[in-house]
Every structure is written in C-alpha cells, then in structure tokens.
Amino acid sequence: MVTSSDQIQNGSEEQSKRSEIYTYEAPWQIYAMNWSIRRDKKYRLAITSLIEQYPNRVEIVQLDESNGEIRSDPNLCFEHPYPPTKTSFIPDKECQRPDLLATSSDFLRLWRISDDESRVELKSCLSSDKNSEFSGPITSFDWNEAEPRRIGTSSIDTTCTIWDIEREVVDTQLIAHDKEVYDIAWGGVGVFASVSEDGSVRVFDLRDKEHSTIIYESGEPSTPLVRLSWNKQDPRYMATVIMGSAKIVVLDIRFPALPVVELQRHQASVNAIAWAPHSSSHICSAGDDSQALIWDISSMGQHVEGGLDPILAYTAGAEVEQLQWSSSQPDWVAIAFSNKLQILRV
C-alpha cells in the first residue's frame, strides 16, 4: 500500500526510475484532463480550468523525459468559453488522422493542433440545436475508438447525441433518460450506454434506436448516477458511480439489476473511475478522500469476507477531481487535484 510518498511501491526495482511521480502546477484549478493517444506523443496531456469567469483555459502539456519536468507550451494554450466538462484527444494511436482535441461545455468543440505544433485552431463548434444561440450544457462525451468519426455527447436536456464529426452533422439524437444525462460511454461501434439524474444505466444500440435496455437502477428515488466507464477489454462489464457515494458499482450487462461487486474502500465521494486499457480485471478510482485506488476484480465472482481491498493506493494532496489511465502507456495513470496534475507509474 502506498501513501503520499515519492514512489508507488509495486515490488519491481527494475521498473523504478528516478521518480515514479511527476507533478505539474497550473495557474488555476484543474477540472477536465486527458492523455494523448498517439504513439508519438505518449507523455502529452490536455488540462482545462475551472474558473467562474467566462473565459476559461486549456493547456496542452508534455513530460520532458530528460529532466522529469512537465512543461506547458504557450503556443498550445488557448481560451475556452465556460469550464470544459471533459476533454479528449482523438483515438488515433497510429497517427493516421489530424491531431484533434475535443472539449465539451455549451457546445462540442473540436480543436486542431498544427503538424508543427505551433498553434491550436478551432476546427468545429457543434450544436444539435441550430435554432438557438444557446445550447443545453453538455455534461460529458465519449469518442468512439472503433470509429473515430463518431462522438457521443450527453446533455442536461435528457438527450444523447451521436455526431459525425467529419461531416459535422448529427447522426442520431435520442431522448435517453427522464432527467439530465451525466455521462456516456461507447461499448463498441454502434453500442453506447449512459447514466442519469434518474438513477439508471441504459444501453442503446444504434441499429434499434426505439429501444434501450436498463442495466441498473440505483434503487433509491432521486439518487443520480454521475459517472460511467465501460470495460474496453471485456465489454460485458461496466462501472458506475452514485452521486455523493463512496462506492463503485461494477455491473455485468448479461445480468441486469444486480451489481457483480461493489468496491467500498473510499472514505468520501468517488469522483472518477477508469478501467485499465490493457487488462480486463483492473479498474482505478479516485475521490474526495484524496485517494486514487487500483482494484483487481478478477475474484469478483467469489465471496470475499468484508469486500475487496485495492491492490494499490496513492494519497494525493487534496480531493481528486479527475483520473485518466493512459491507453498508449498502460503503466501510467494521471490524476488532477486542486491546481495540480500528477502522472503516476503504476
């Protein structure tokens, strides 16, 4: 187990570098954050601000491996209307597509990073309501890894919208829930799920847009579900978080209604969850107890007295708002707390 030390103890001396933790301090509180997926930009991340004033900020930062410093490039910093609720780089490991970054707030925006990395330009500003100057805030989005021209967004107006970002048109818009939709996740080319203020996890298949399957309901009236993560290595499993709850609920879509396991070692509300991109049995969580925990759920079918314990723990300096696991480098996890970004070797 690890506390707030300079290294995460994982038992392997060979893996130990000069430091296992790198920290970047932003001039503002960080909210959204994500890793680059491109093979040639493996230590690059985007971070966004949480500022009450209208113009917020987005920075693209990079770890300099030679000296262990995470640096911000002034050419790749830009203003953003309102605080972004999420940011994500295009899922393009092989660098075959334009280098794009997406952000969500009032609209879904796509930003293009120039080939020489000298500037960032707004490529698209997408709104599903063409008749209005304003749009219902977008709470989250997910970029389809199998079909990167598709992005799904969730909104407080109860809808999920599937965008074709190449044609800049709405592919599909569905009334997904009875109340605000807080998160969305793809489970394949044409299948996605969402969670809502109404307390349900629903799965949608784009081949049958009239119907959805309720996989789980929080059980108590007015208990919203706020986060959703779909296991990319084993799409039978997904995980969700109940608003204000210290537990993570893991679901098997083959057996709706009952969780297969509930992970209950956080001491305060969970804010973020992420499945390992390289392992079907590992998931990371982070929350208001300042902890980031990694769990091995391979034994989840068996009864464990007192419940599962995490296999790895890290204590940050404040409540952890954001967590992302690098898909291009699966031994690295990034967390954001207060004005700090940390990348941790796990």
From Swiss-Prot:
Described function: Clock protein essential for the proper expression phase and period length of both the oscillator and output genes known to participate in photoperiod sensing. Required for the expression of APRR9, APRR7, and APRR5. Regulated by APRR9 and APRR7 at the transcriptional level, indicating the existence of a positive feedback loop within the circadian clock.
SMART domains named among the record's database cross-references: WD40
Superkingdom to which the source organism belongs: Eukaryota
Keyword Nucleus among record annotations: no
WD repeat positions: 79-121, 133-173, 176-214, 265-305
Record's protein name: WD repeat-containing protein LWD2
Keywords annotated in UniProt: Acetylation, Biological rhythms, Repeat, Sensory transduction, WD repeat
InterPro entries: DCAF7-like, WD40/YVTN_repeat-like_dom_sf, WD40_repeat_CS, WD40_repeat_dom_sf, WD40_rpt
GO biological process, one term: rhythmic process
Disrupted-gene phenotype: Plants lacking LWD2 do not show obvious phenotypic alterations. Plants lacking both LWD1 and LWD2 are early flowering and this phenotype is more prominent under short-day conditions.
Claim: Coiled coil is one of the keywords in the record: no
Induction section of the entry: Circadian-regulation. Up-regulated y virus infection.
Gene name of the encoded protein: LWD2
N-acetylmethionine: residues carrying this PTM: 1
Organism: Arabidopsis thaliana
